[in-house]
């Protein structure tokens, strides 16, 4: 599509319409922009008044002397055609009438019928051989009409050409021998005067030559041929046979006809005589117009075509529509009549169309696809040497002109085909296709042999155009006020325009040029533009210098980011592996790094301060328990991470230091936020009398800190530490990244953890007071109140408070609070248990409270896990309360359970051992004990020996109150006595099966003067005695060897509990006995058994 309008002097070129250039001096460029290539001035499509008058005369003459029926889509009325010509030539009515009258007075042309006899098929075979030797006689009969009106209803004509048309006006074709389907393809020009009473006659004859009978019999093939011989014998010798005729009225013909006509007979004999293919064209000879007399017909038609197409395009522009290449019916009719009357060949018509369209395309706006049809027609009909020398020069000039103009459009394709217009890509692609097809033509190769290949020409045009476009953009971005900041902003705008242009080349234009010409526009444009950009950026950074202000730093950062984006386009070009001017461009920005980092921190700090100041410390919603400042802080940190990713500094060592700075600033901001948010909480709660509101704010503060800790924990992923570690692996010492970045992160997390724990500790302290009060009340409740009822106030208090905290704290902080409360609760319970050691009732309440508190803090898996609940303190308290809540007899039983366990674990016989056999006979309810012996007893007498005996008692005594203790015989001076004595105890089996039930064997050294000395004790559990574990009577009873043990010298916890129960006589008796035994054991130097 052309871009120059009809009058370059009146309307500015399209290029200057698309890009408004600011005219000002360029002072800050060291290299002036190159001189722009001059715009191609296309040849004017307007004619001089004299030329237009001659052409108008010839066009009117064509309409006035129209011949034949109109074509189906053509205009019938001459007045309409004359009116159209008046508009197309912009002729005033008066001038039109004068010219029309003058044309009417001109001499009429000689009317001619150009008849071409192409061929025939299916004609009659008149010769003996079954074939004919056909030829045609044709001419025009003047003054006699053809009856019947139309050709379809005419009667058969018995008259023949030789009888109706003078011989000098009769034309004859060649004779085609021996065929039924002759081909002539001969053309004849037949003149006539009046089309209304003229008719075309064509007779087809079979040439008859004189042959002998012998020759004819030799050609005989069947009986039908024999009949022909007899018929010819009756005919005069040398008389030709009639094959058929075609008679047409000229006024029934169109300007051009191309049809098959049936051959009509003179009689009813053989009505089907075949068909004849005829072509007709009604033409003029000796036209009286000045243009026809002075100029070749081809030239006149070319000018007429150019004038009418120009008018068609202008009419569409006036209606704000684009011409699609279709001529109006009026224009098509006039051009068809003119070409027909001038007898222009199809080739010359195509050539005229090409010359006219190629000229008009350079000055009017219409689709370049209109050029494809004449190109194709010329290529199809091209024959070398067909054109005269001047026509060849004209055609070569049109090729050269269109190629030059097309290249100028391609050079300026960014402005000529803007993407803001939807059909621009299609228009450019159409232009390229036209140029490709033109350069591939045989005519182009012969007439323009020295033209460089089209891809080379287009590539050079694109390179030049890209450079010109860059300099135009550079001028467009020149600031009104000269200065370094303004120059930086202008350069940034220029780089962004370059990036946008490259994106357009990549997405749209590259595909068009590659598919059409195999040219990679994007790679070429990237190579050219990156070099131009690199030079200007380097010059600018040099002017800025090493001291970078905050304002200049922001400008340089945006410029750096834009250059990164520009360099990333390298991967899409063919230059990805080459050396580019923008390689290592980051070095030009090194002085600006401190300014960038400081500005990033300052902006983030200001945003944090602003966010905290506007925070009302209210949760964002039911599911979001932190406040607005936490969200703003997360966004702030995300922006810092985004800035770090944008920076993505190429140098590994410097990138590491930049990352260290980012992490340091982020951690510092986190701690600053903690201080600010706590101060904000104090500010908001200072005037609050409602402690619940203060607790709410404290919960929000703690949640905000927890949210901050989660955000900080994502720093390694957001700043891509793993990728950084791989990059700096060859530069830094091993472990340096871990020691630096991770140490900073852990320090910040530790600080946040401390702040969170402090906040949670404050919340816990508010609850701990209430927990301690309820536990104290629990201990002091009346004895008549059931334990389950006594703990209700404590449990309700915890339910309300913990539900509140669970609602207002995030899960992590709520778990931390539960841990603190649980630890404190255990501490309070331990203190209460210690103060109530002597009260089994109070201890039982505490025991039940501990069980319920464990369930409460576990909360069916929603609270603390069992591992966190079952601490050492909990387990010790649980054991202590289990003991304290027990009765005296239960404690005595537990004591014996403990001694039985001690007996089972003792393997050393340093105190000696006793051997017994015990069994139980359920039928007799008798426990039978055989005390066999003792061995390795300690010598307790001064003589180095002992007088041992064994005391047997069933314990606990409250289970066996009726059974008295038994004793063995005393053995003098014997450390290995053999007792061999049997004892029977009448006792039911049930008490013997209870836990703690045992046979206590106390080995004593008999002392005549004083109290007996204790050798040791042994405990035989009764539930293990044969006969008690089952219903069967015991058989062979095994011996049991029991090492002797001492009671613990420091006292037993159970004995201490029993000792504290002063009012329980049974407990006091038991304690005195066990204390006496412990005292006896402590008098010996040997260490007691563990």
Curated annotation (Swiss-Prot):
Its cofactor is Ca(2+). Residues 92-239, 910-1035 form the C2 domain. It is found in: Cytoplasm; Membrane; Late endosome; Recycling endosome. Residues 788-895 form the MHD2 domain. Residues 1026-1048 are annotated as: Disordered. Ca(2+) 2 binds at residues 941, 947, 1005, 1007. Residues 557-677 form the MHD1 domain. Residues 240-543 are annotated as: Interaction with RAB27A. It comes from the Eukaryota. Its main location: cytoplasm. The keyword Nucleotidyltransferase does not apply. Ca(2+) 3 binds at residues 940-941, 1005, 1007, 1013. One of its GO terms (biological process) is natural killer cell degranulation. Interacts with DOC2A. Interacts with RAB27A. Interacts with RHOG; the interaction increases RhoG affinity to the membrane lipids, targets UNC13D to membrane lipids and facilitates cytotoxic granule (CG) docking to the plasma membrane. Belongs to the unc-13 family. The MHD1 and MHD2 domains mediate localization on recycling endosomes and lysosome. This is Protein unc-13 homolog D. It comes from Homo sapiens.
